[in-house]
From Swiss-Prot:
Subcellular location, record wording: Cell inner membrane
Enzyme Commission designation: 7.-.-.-
GO annotation terms (biological process): electron transport chain
Protein name: Ion-translocating oxidoreductase complex subunit G
A GO cellular component entry from the record: plasma membrane
Enzyme class: translocase
SMART domains the record matches: FMN_bind
Subunit annotation: The complex is composed of six subunits: RnfA, RnfB, RnfC, RnfD, RnfE and RnfG.
Keyword hit for Cell cycle: no
Swiss-Prot/TrEMBL keywords: Cell inner membrane, Cell membrane, Electron transport, Flavoprotein, FMN, Membrane, Phosphoprotein, Translocase, Transmembrane, Transmembrane helix, Transport
Designated gene of the protein: rnfG
InterPro entries: FMN-bd, Ion_transpt_RnfG/RsxG
Protein's UniProt keywords contain DNA repair: no
Length: 211
């Protein structure tokens, strides 16, 4: 009886070790592939907010981390520096809209040296399908309305939904979500306008990791 119990215990131990080893091996073999896929997805988004014609450097490897309350969080946010012939041409910066209807909304905005928005995309959100999710380009083209716009002292108050006297469309039954994104993009652009030199002087220290 005791011998049988020992044999069963040994069998279970061997099985557990084999299973653990197989999981570890699978993770090891797929880790590089996952990282490669993440880099491809990141590059695809970056090329949507900074045209490929505006840079000749590897954007995912030209990344620094910046911190400012205007980015909607006190966590350091990845910021990608586009250069051409060694000269900076644009910045793509991630930021947070902390006041979305269902929580935080993460966006990325490309901004040229004159403070003009080259493109904005939503990276992640939890907004209600059919209502707040219209901020997502896969659902509607609303997010494209930021392209070409600038943030100045004169037009600051126009960075609102039309219902509040601004220039941006709201969604039927979902005003909180666009308000949050508009405010986040405005504050992000304002931060870059005020801190461009400081951003460009930062060391490249996040190596394209989306932290």
């Amino acid at each position: 009886m005791l011998t049988a119990i020992r044999k069963n215990g040994l069998t279970l131990a061997i099985f557990a070790c084999a299973t653990t080893g197989l999981v570890a091996l699978t993770q090891y073999l797929t880790e590089d592939q996952i990282k490669l896929q993440e880099q491809k997805q990141l590059l695809s988004v970056l090329n949507q907010v900074i045209p490929e014609t505006m840079h000749d450097n590897a954007l995912t490897q030209s990344c620094t981390l910046v911190t400012s309350p205007e980015l909607g969080t006190m966590h350091a946010m990845p910021t990608y520096i586009a250069t051409k012939n060694g000269e900076p041409t644009a910045i793509a910066i991630e930021s947070i809209a902390p006041d979305g209807y269902n929580g935080e909304i993460k966006v990325i905005t490309g901004i040229d040296n004159q403070g003009k928005i080259l493109g904005t995309r939503v990276l992640s959100h939890q907004e209600t399908p059919g209502l707040g999710d219209k901020i997502d380009l896969r659902v509607t083209s609303w997010i494209l309305g930021f392209t070409g716009k600038q943030v100045t002292e004169d037009n600051w108050n126009s960075w609102k939904v039309r219902k509040d006297g601004g220039d941006f469309d709201q969604f039927t039954g979902a005003t909180i979500t666009p308000r949050a994104v508009i405010k986040a993009v405005r504050n992000t652009v304002n931060y870059v306008n005020q801190s461009r030199d400081e951003i460009l002087s930062q060391p490249l220290n996040c190596a394209g990791d989306n932290q």
